């Protein structure tokens, strides 16, 4: 397994690169560069005429990409992956891409850096933005949002069963002292949560929900997946690693939707070609989860799921 820094171990690395790298001279997009683990492994598998375009909205990821500056096959673009269609248009890569990789979620360096505000285990500013140069912070949103809006976010994006109770406590507590720190929020959630789950901090779901909301994560995933259909050439691979059920359900639905032919009433005299006219993808194998050895090495990989699809037509 390739490690790009002492802090970061790429998840499902061998499995994802094996699925992705079908042409050693192809053009590939790593839509979630992070600290470059998957990009490095991919470049190691490719020939001199290959091309890898990496995207990331995190300024720290862009800085980490300097390690690849001497490789002429590599290009980094500072943009969220939801802008994938714009990147494809700008680089004239529609229907030209051999494989697109998405490694969703938060990287270990982001979680471990208290100043980013993603972790309830480390006290830091309540920020949670993937791109720290723009947008509303988690603290700003929590200190202004209506109780019902907070409750909806916690329930919808965190599947938090105590969403209303936590939202009410947030609104009540912020009147005395606005939320500014991760520890402040985590301790409040622990205080008001009536049930403590074994091996799970009470703030886990709330922090996930707020992060997804602040970064519009699910909306960005949907936009990027749709754009991938424009970019992939025939037989090109879509490879997606997700880390929680909301992401995985979204990816699974997307692949299933585009793997089905036209839905017609039974008994109609139509050819197989006509029935498959709207089919854009074909699922490749079953979902892949990390083995015991990987989970022991990197416990954060436990919830990860890898899904693979192949582009089946090019029009």
From Swiss-Prot:
Main localization category: cytoplasm
Q: Which InterPro entries match?
A: RsmH (IPR002903), SAM-dep_MeTrfase_MraW_recog (IPR023397), SAM-dependent_MTases_sf (IPR029063)
Q: Does the keyword rRNA processing apply?
A: yes
A Pfam family it matches: Methyltransf_5
Q: Which GO terms describe its molecular function?
A: rRNA (cytosine-N4-)-methyltransferase activity
The signal peptide stretch is none
> Disulfide connectivity?
none
Task: Give the domain of life.
Answer: Bacteria
- Binding positions for S-adenosyl-L-methionine? 36-38, 56, 81, 103, 110
Cellular component terms (Gene Ontology): cytoplasm
Localization, per the record, is: Cytoplasm
The keyword rRNA-binding is annotated on this UniProt entry = no
Alphabetical UniProt keywords: Cytoplasm, Methyltransferase, rRNA processing, S-adenosyl-L-methionine, Transferase
SUPFAM superfamilies assigned to the protein according to its UniProt record, in alphabetical order: Putative methyltransferase TM0872, insert domain, S-adenosyl-L-methionine-dependent methyltransferases
Q: Name one GO biological process term.
A: rRNA base methylation
**Protein family according to the UniProt entry:** Belongs to the methyltransferase superfamily. RsmH family.
What's the protein name?
Ribosomal RNA small subunit methyltransferase H
Tell me the organism: Idiomarina loihiensis (strain ATCC BAA-735 / DSM 15497 / L2-TR)
Query: Lineage of the source organism?
Result: Bacteria, Pseudomonadati, Pseudomonadota, Gammaproteobacteria, Alteromonadales
């Amino acid at each position: 397994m390739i490690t790009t820094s002492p802090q970061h171990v790429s998840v499902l690395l061998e499995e994802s690169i094996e699925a992705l790298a079908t042409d050693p001279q192809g053009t590939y997009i790593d839509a979630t560069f992070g600290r470059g683990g998957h990009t490095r492994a991919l470049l190691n598998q490719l020939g001199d005429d290959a091309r890898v375009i990496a995207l990331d909205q995190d300024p720290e990821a862009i800085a980490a990409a300097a390690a690849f500056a001497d490789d002429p096959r590599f290009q980094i673009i500072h943009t969220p992956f939801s802008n994938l269609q714009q990147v494809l248009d700008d680089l004239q890569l529609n229907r030209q891409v051999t494989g697109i990789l998405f490694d969703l979620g938060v990287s270990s360096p982001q979680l471990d850096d208290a100043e980013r505000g993603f972790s309830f285990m480390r006290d830091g500013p309540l920020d949670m933005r993937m791109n720290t140069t723009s947008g509303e912070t988690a603290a700003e949103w929590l200190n202004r949002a209506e109780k019902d809006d907070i409750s909806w976010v916690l329930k919808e994006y965190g599947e938090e069963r105590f969403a209303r109770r936590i939202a009410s406590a947030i609104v009540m507590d912020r009147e005395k002292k606005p939320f500014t720190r991760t520890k402040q929020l985590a301790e409040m959630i622990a205080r008001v949560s009536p049930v403590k789950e074994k091996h799970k901090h009470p703030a886990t779901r709330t922090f996930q929900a707020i992060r997804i909301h602040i970064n519009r994560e699910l909306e960005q995933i949907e936009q990027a997946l749709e754009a991938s259909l424009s970019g992939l050439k025939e037989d090109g691979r879509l490879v997606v690693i997700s880390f929680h059920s909301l992401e995985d359900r979204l990816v699974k639905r997307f692949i299933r939707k585009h793997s089905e032919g036209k839905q017609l009433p039974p008994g109609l005299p139509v050819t197989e070609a006509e029935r498959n006219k709207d089919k854009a993808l074909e699922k490749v194998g079953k979902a892949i989860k990390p083995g015991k050895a990987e989970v022991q090495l990197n416990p954060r990989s436990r919830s990860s799921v890898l899904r693979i699809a192949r582009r089946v037509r090019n029009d």
